[in-house]
């Protein structure tokens, strides 16, 4: 192909492996008992929190005990995680407790009614003053800002889903271990030497010896799978990324003080340029790309769904249709359920509650000359990310020793 030509993909209006809400969190619980009164519910809380075990073993294919899971921080990711987990069949996880400073009434209400996800199609209610019930599944609620004080040891907690965004280094996350938990999964980029795993990219490297792990960021989970495909098929020399990202709770509703002067400005009124470590973090899961990628974020006035714009120089000459074909092949095989390719002319809201980590917008794939590739990928930065947190927690459970 001539070096001054621009190649743009020609979509055939098909959607490959779209994966919208397969695990929508709207399925009913498979627990073998009905809804009961508050006395029975509290008795069940006592049974759950004092049950022996947590380690999983299998005999003739029957799971003898599930991994006992605590959620620390019941915000956007914490509640999305619970909905995603609730929608899974035969999960190896058992969520038994939530640490939430808002208390039982708030935890129950915000789980049931969500401005983005809609009303949870489950029977959600308080169970006394120290638990909530989700389709008869009783989950204890505790409240303490210091993880060291949490009752993880007494409750036999195997895995903590660390969803506050605060305890992201070894010292902070390690407080859960001090409290008696056996492992911690951080739902944010980890700091220091904490192992980082992105499902579909490097999760096979996880071993039971890891006590604290990170699921990386939502943007890294979107970027890494298709970057892996690009590098394997065409060889990435260098590149830059921009994520046009929905605003988050870290921003201000109206102008107010913030350590980042741009994030101090009203989130719903501005396009806010800010930093992101997502591109550099790809090197944590794909070490051969260290130093080859960088990027920024543009926070925009939408509440959910974001989109990555990646431009890379590649070593192998190519054209847009060939790039999309590589994505389709991976989406149908090793990255099935992680990556998808969409040929429809859609907009951000159409990707709300998408289960996959990233959806390639094939009509926007471009190749300038024959070695500069531009790829656009959509992702639900809450729901899709939370599905991967559940996936990684499942891997922890399945590799339990």
Curated annotation (Swiss-Prot):
Targeting presequence: 1-65
The keyword NADP belongs to this UniProt entry's keyword annotation: yes
Binding residue positions for D-glyceraldehyde 3-phosphate: 217-219, 248, 263, 276-277, 299
Cellular component terms (Gene Ontology): chloroplast
Catalytic site: 218
Site note Activates thiol group during catalysis, residues: 245
Broad EC category: oxidoreductase
Enzyme Commission number(s) from the entry: 1.2.1.13
GO molecular function: glyceraldehyde-3-phosphate dehydrogenase (NAD+) (phosphorylating) activity; glyceraldehyde-3-phosphate dehydrogenase (NADP+) (phosphorylating) activity; NAD binding; NADP binding
Protein's name in the database: Glyceraldehyde-3-phosphate dehydrogenase A, chloroplastic
Species per Swiss-Prot/TrEMBL record: Spinacia oleracea
